[in-house]
């Protein structure tokens, strides 16, 4: 699995060099959320490369550092597709590759509306050692992460996940609600979860000058997420829940930095999750690839 991680890092490095060499026009602001989704999709033909990291505390076991890379592509104006590569390091244990995920988001309505629905469909192949905690679902609790990597990686999970994203933007504020339903493709019941988010730029009026530290480059907010049990036991019993402030810094160069300290809200949750991420937009990536392989401009 070490060779896989090396290949992932090599791919990210190569694409990052390409992104630096590619001129970046003025881009739309990225939201600050790490778990919740709003209704904005990737621009058609653009590729966004993202790296995220989560440090998590573990009562009764070793703390961990989970990380994942995302490659998000705007296929059309109404469809964004994304590939995830996940890994984790459990302190005093080992570093392992934990899975892949293919995510698709579909915009249902054209234009802006008071409520903007987006359909989310995801397939995930992962091991039981996956710790990225990208969503809350079912009866997942902190104690589930106690197994050593050598044992947890033996469990193989093939999962389908569906979300209904309802998002609205009003006077600069974005409010979003995500409802989740996930199904292990083995003989397991449907599991449910939620994510809520609210955010706003620190300033709505853009500066006349290009600057890195202008208030409008910062988007702040909060998100809350957790599990809602499964088909046989729906509700809050034996579920975990988190509340996290979120902050995004959108640089004129096309880079976005995110940070989010998260706090467990009950005894089933990890007490503390520290998340951060960096993203870079490559505009016109689809056109560049088409030209490279002899397509039309």
Question: What annotation goes with each model-predicted range?
Answer:
Residues 6-8, 34:
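Short helix-onset patch at the extreme N-terminus, typifying the N->h transition
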Residues 27-297:
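Transmembrane beta-barrel domains of Gram-negative outer membranes and organellar outer membranes
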Residues 1-5:
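N-terminal secretory signal peptides that target proteins for export/translocation
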Residues 8-23:
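Bacterial N-terminal signal peptides
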């Amino acid at each position: 699995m070490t060779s896989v991680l090396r290949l992932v890092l090599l791919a990210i490095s190569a694409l990052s060099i390409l992104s630096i060499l590619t001129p970046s026009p003025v881009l739309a602001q990225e939201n600050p959320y790490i778990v919740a989704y709003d209704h904005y999709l990737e621009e058609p033909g653009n590729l966004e490369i993202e790296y995220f990291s989560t440090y998590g505390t573990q009562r009764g076991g070793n703390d961990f550092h989970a990380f994942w890379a995302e490659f998000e592509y705007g296929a059309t104006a109404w469809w964004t597709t994304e590939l995830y590569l996940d890994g984790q390091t459990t302190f005093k244990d080992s570093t392992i590759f934990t899975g892949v995920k293919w995510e698709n988001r579909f915009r249902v309505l054209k234009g802006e509306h008071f409520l903007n629905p987006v359909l989310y469909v995801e397939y995930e192949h992962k091991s039981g050692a996956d710790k990225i905690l990208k969503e809350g679902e079912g009866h997942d609790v902190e104690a589930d992460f106690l197994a050593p990597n050598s044992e947890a990686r033996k469990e193989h999970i093939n999962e389908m996940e569906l979300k209904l994203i309802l998002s609205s933007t009003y006077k600069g504020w974005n409010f979003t609600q995500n409802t989740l339903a996930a199904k292990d493709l083995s003989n397991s019941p449907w599991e449910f979860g939620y994510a809520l988010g609210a955010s706003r730029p620190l300033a709505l009026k853009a500066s006349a000058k290009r600057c890195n530290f202008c208030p409008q480059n910062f988007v702040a907010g909060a998100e809350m997420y957790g599990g809602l049990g499964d088909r046989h036991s729906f509700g809050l019993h034996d579920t975990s829940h988190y509340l996290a402030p979120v902050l995004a810094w959108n640089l004129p160069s096309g880079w976005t930095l995110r940070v989010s300290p998260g706090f467990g809200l009950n005894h089933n949750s990890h007490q503390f999750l520290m998340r951060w991420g960096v993203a870079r937009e490559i505009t016109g990536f689809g056109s560049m690839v088409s030209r490279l392989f002899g397509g039309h401009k």
